[in-house]
From Swiss-Prot:
SUPFAM superfamilies: Nucleic acid-binding proteins (SSF50249), Translation proteins SH3-like domain (SSF50104). Signal peptide: none annotated. GO terms for molecular function: translation elongation factor activity. This is Elongation factor P. GO terms for biological process: peptide biosynthetic process. The gene is efp. Involved in peptide bond synthesis. Stimulates efficient translation and peptide-bond synthesis on native or reconstituted 70S ribosomes in vitro. Probably functions indirectly by altering the affinity of the ribosome for aminoacyl-tRNA, thus increasing their reactivity as acceptors for peptidyl transferase. It is found in: Cytoplasm. InterPro entries: Elong-fact-P_C, NA-bd_OB-fold, Rib_uL2_dom2, Transl_elong_fac_P/YeiP, Transl_elong_KOW-like, Transl_elong_P/YeiP_cen, Transl_elong_P/YeiP_CS, Transl_elongation_fac_P.
Length: 185
C-alpha cells in the first residue's frame, strides 16, 4: 500500500484491477476543508489517461512491476519470440503487447520486458538504436547538413526523417522515444 502523500511521477498503483502510472500530481491544501491530492494517471495496459482526486493520506495498493532483460530472438507469424537472459526461457509477445516501438525491434536486440504478475504490460527498448538505411532518395550535389531532411526506410521497416546528405546503406543512430535521427554510425 502507498499513501497518496507519497505519489510521484512514475509511481504505479492498482485501481479497479488495472495498473495506472502517476504522470502528474498536485498536493492541494485549501483554506477550508481537508487536503487532497489531484493526480493525472495513465493506464499502463490501454494507454488511456484520467484525472483522479485522492484524500490526503488515503492509501491505495502499489503495483509491483518486474523488469527482466530479454533478447528478441526471432519473429514467428504475428508473435515476437523473446528469450530471458537469466533463465533462457522463451516467451512470446504480440505486436500490441510491445506497442508502437515494435518498428525499431531487431533480432538479437535486448529489451526490458515489464510484467505485473504473469501479465506483460510492455517492452522498453534502448533509448537509441543503430540501424541500416535500406531505402532513401539519393543526395544531390550541394546538399548540406542544414539543408533539410528526407524520409528514409530502415532495416526494420521504420521510416524516419534524415538529413539530405545521408545515403542508402549507411548505418544511423535513431532515438526510439522521439522517432528522430541522432547521428551517423
Amino acid at each position: 500500500m502507498i499513501s497518496s502523500n507519497d505519489f510521484r511521477p512514475g509511481v504505479s498503483i492498482v485501481l479497479d484491477g488495472s495498473v495506472w502510472r502517476v504522470l502528474e500530481f498536485l498536493h492541494v491544501k485549501p483554506g477550508k476543508g481537508s487536503a487532497f491530492v489531484r493526480t493525472k494517471l495513465k493506464n499502463v495496459q490501454s494507454g488511456s489517461v484520467m484525472e483522479k482526486t485522492f484524500r490526503a493520506g488515503e492509501t491505495v495498493p502499489q503495483a509491483t512491476l518486474e523488469k527482466s532483460t530479454m533478447q528478441h530472438t526471432y519473429k514467428e507469424g504475428d508473435e515476437f519470440v523473446f528469450m530471458d537472459m537469466e533463465t533462457y526461457e522463451e516467451g512470446r509477445l504480440t505486436r500490441t503487447q510491445i506497442g508502437d516501438r515494435v518498428k525499431y525491434l531487431k533480432e538479437g536486440m535486448e529489451a526490458e520486458v515489464i510484467k505485473w504478475g504473469d501479465q506483460v504490460l510492455g517492452v522498453e527498448l534502448p533509448k537509441s538504436v543503430v540501424l541500416e538505411i535500406v531505402q532513401t532518395d539519393p543526395g544531390l550535389k550541394g546538399d548540406t547538413a542544414t539543408g533539410g531532411s528526407k524520409p528514409a526506410t530502415l532495416e526494420t521497416g521504420a521510416i524516419v526523417m534524415v538529413p539530405l546528405f545521408i545515403s542508402q546503406g549507411e548505418r544511423i543512430k535513431v532515438d526510439t522515444q522521439e522517432d528522430k535521427y541522432i547521428s551517423r554510425e
